[in-house]
């Protein structure tokens, strides 16, 4: 089990990303736009850099919904490999069967 502080930190990051998403998209559009003046592009770059680090979606980490484990998480299920295996063995995951050949 991951520490509660780590789970809460990740939750806080998700909220921060959602809060700044629209503004970040606008600033990135200005930076990429070649028709915008160099001054406007520079100001957008500086404004983007002044935003909190956690406003970037790249800093979010996928975690297991049950244990909070940061590694070995399957995106499709949102579960860590251990908990996914346990759920599959119980038959809780429809269509998922243990490989046998």
From Swiss-Prot:
One of its GO terms (biological process) is translation. Keywords: Ribonucleoprotein, Ribosomal protein, RNA-binding, rRNA-binding. One of its GO terms (cellular component) is cytoplasm. Disulfide bonds: none annotated. The keyword rRNA-binding applies. Part of the 30S ribosomal subunit. Contacts proteins S3 and S10. This is Small ribosomal subunit protein uS14.
């Amino acid at each position: 089990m991951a520490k509660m502080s780590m789970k809460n930190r990740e939750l806080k990051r998700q909220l921060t990303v959602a809060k700044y998403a629209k503004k970040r998209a606008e600033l990135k559009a200005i930076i990429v736009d070649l028709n915008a003046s160099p001054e406007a592009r520079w100001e957008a770059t500086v404004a983007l850099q002044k935003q909190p680090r956690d406003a970037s979606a790249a800093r979010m980490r996928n975690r297991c919904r049950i244990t909070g484990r940061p590694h070995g998480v399957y995106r499709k299920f949102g579960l860590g490999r251990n908990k996914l295996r346990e759920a599959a063995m119980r038959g809780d995951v429809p269509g998922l069967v243990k490989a046998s050949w």
